[in-house]
């Protein structure tokens, strides 16, 4: 809601603590998974702080999400911490604004059309099956780093081309690059940010070689790079080389980091709930799955859909996001000043007991047709964000999650090894502190 400047000035700014000069509470934010929860308990559901040198107001809940997501470009515009903006690059969809963002989103969406996703399925399935075969031979697995390799292999194959995924340098460079995305922007050789900048330069140089090689080959739209090379903007011009590099790097990040977190959470939660694991298996047994999985077969698993929705609710791969206020406004009796940032909290929304009774419980029954979650208001379940900036690849993520879950449940049972720390590290995406050590039991 927008009110007159006079009325706004009479409203209080939300309570909170700015912390240290410039730095504010950045270190606590990066290192404490309960940062938002603790401050909500202290100050209430809307509070202020300072992060990365910026004043920030935290909000959560379905109503707050609706307020933010429906006022994009009117009251809010997308923004990222400085380190993230620099490392994603000026030509990545995530950092583009206005008409350029609209135009590029339309182009990139071609890589995630239903027919395109269907065409990805055989290669995705082959990669997943290959990793499952490796893990079965190993018996005991430290799962999280293995999941990272698998999702990167899928992303590199489907976004850049099959041969590229065999380049042994890409994965370690990419791991270093990701570690600095949400860091303090200090460009020194031994800082996370400095190391990430160097890794980004190496990745961009390699991407340039790949793109130039593809430009010499016959056109092919079998992967995202081929689609982007064939695309034309609103002026009927091809995308520039700098933009192609930034967009592909963004796709690799988006199709790898958060997906790994989601798959890890699935493995963790179903490892802790054998009854739910068995019910998923029973649903599969009724379908008599063949060697080749199709998109139509995957659509016939409503209980698995519920399980995945609950995984994304309980441990969302992205804890929240940022918007910048481009004009003063008010929300729930507080003044939100122009130039400040607003952070919407996915984790806190998903833990709201008014939306999800007993929110700490893993309960897929919430998402049955008559379950409590199906009666929630819009923007109560937002694992992929919302509005104009909703995750473009959300259906790609759902497809990979569902395919992986299906093949895993079909071929293996698993137990979590004792003596490990399952507490979640939250930056940049949630993962168990000891990387999820498991013992696999083959069912084939």
Curated annotation (Swiss-Prot):
PROSITE patterns: CYTOCHROME_P450
Keywords: Heme, Iron, Metal-binding, Monooxygenase, Oxidoreductase
Alphabetical list of Pfam families matching this protein: p450
Enzyme Commission (EC) number: 1.14.-.-
Gene3D superfamilies given in the database record: Cytochrome P450
Cofactor: heme
Protein residues bound to heme: 391
Annotated InterPro entries: Cyt_P450, Cyt_P450_CS, Cyt_P450_E_grp-I, Cyt_P450_sf
The keyword Phosphoprotein belongs to this UniProt entry's keyword annotation: no
MF GO annotations: heme binding; iron ion binding; monooxygenase activity; oxidoreductase activity, acting on paired donors, with incorporation or reduction of molecular oxygen
The family this protein is said to belong to: Belongs to the cytochrome P450 family.
Name this polypeptide is given: Putative cytochrome P450 120
Species this chain originates from: Synechocystis sp. (strain ATCC 27184 / PCC 6803 / Kazusa)
């Amino acid at each position: 809601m927008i009110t007159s400047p006079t009325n706004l000035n009479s409203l209080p700014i939300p309570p909170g603590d700015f912390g240290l000069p410039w730095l504010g509470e950045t270190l606590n934010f990066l290192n404490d998974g309960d940062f938002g929860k603790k401050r909500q308990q202290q100050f209430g559901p809307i509070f202020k702080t300072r992060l990365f040198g910026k004043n920030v107001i935290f909000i959560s809940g379905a109503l707050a999400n609706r307020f933010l997501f429906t006022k994009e470009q009117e009251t809010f515009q997308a923004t990222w911490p400085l380190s993230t903006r620099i490392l994603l690059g000026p030509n990545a969809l995530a950092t583009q604004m206005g008409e350029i963002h609209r135009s590029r989103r339309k182009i990139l969406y071609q890589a995630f059309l239903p027919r395109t996703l269907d065409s990805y399925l055989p290669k995705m399935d082959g990669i997943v099956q290959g990793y499952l075969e490796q893990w079965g031979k190993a018996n005991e697995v430290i799962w999280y780093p293995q999941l990272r390799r698998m999702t990167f292999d899928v992303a590199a194959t489907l976004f850049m081309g099959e041969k590229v995924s065999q380049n042994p340098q890409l994965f370690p460079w990419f791991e270093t690059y990701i570690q600095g995305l949400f860091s303090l922007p200090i460009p020194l050789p031994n800082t996370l940010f400095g190391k990430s900048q160097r890794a980004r330069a190496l990745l961009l140089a390699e991407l340039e070689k790949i793109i130039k090689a593809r430009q010499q080959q016959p056109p092919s739209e079998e992967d995202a790079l081929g689609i982007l090379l064939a695309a034309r903007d609103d002026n009927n011009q091809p995308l520039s080389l700098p933009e192609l590099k930034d967009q592909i790097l963004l796709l690799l990040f988006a199709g790898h980091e958060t997906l790994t977190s989601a798959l890890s959470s699935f493995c963790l939660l179903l490892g802790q709930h054998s009854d739910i694991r068995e019910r998923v298996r029973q649903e599969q047994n009724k379908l008599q799955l063949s060697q080749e999985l199709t998109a139509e077969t995957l659509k016939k698993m409503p209980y698995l859909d519920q399980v995945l929705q609950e995984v994304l609710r309980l441990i969302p791969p992205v804890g929240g996001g940022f918007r910048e206020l481009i004009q003063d406004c008010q929300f729930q009796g507080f003044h939100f000043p122009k130039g400040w940032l607003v952070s919407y909290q996915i984790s806190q929304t998903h833990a709201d007991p008014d939306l999800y009774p007993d929110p700490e419980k893993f309960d897929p029954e919430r998402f049955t047709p008559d379950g409590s979650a199906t009666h929630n208001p819009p923007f109560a379940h937002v694992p992929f964000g919302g509005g104009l900036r909703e995750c473009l690849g959300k259906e790609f993520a759902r497809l990979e999650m569902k395919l992986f879950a299906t093949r895993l449940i079909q071929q293996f049972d698993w137990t979590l090894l004792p003596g490990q720390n399952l507490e979640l590290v939250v930056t940049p995406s949630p993962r168990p502190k000891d990387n999820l050590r498991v013992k696999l039991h083959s069912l084939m």
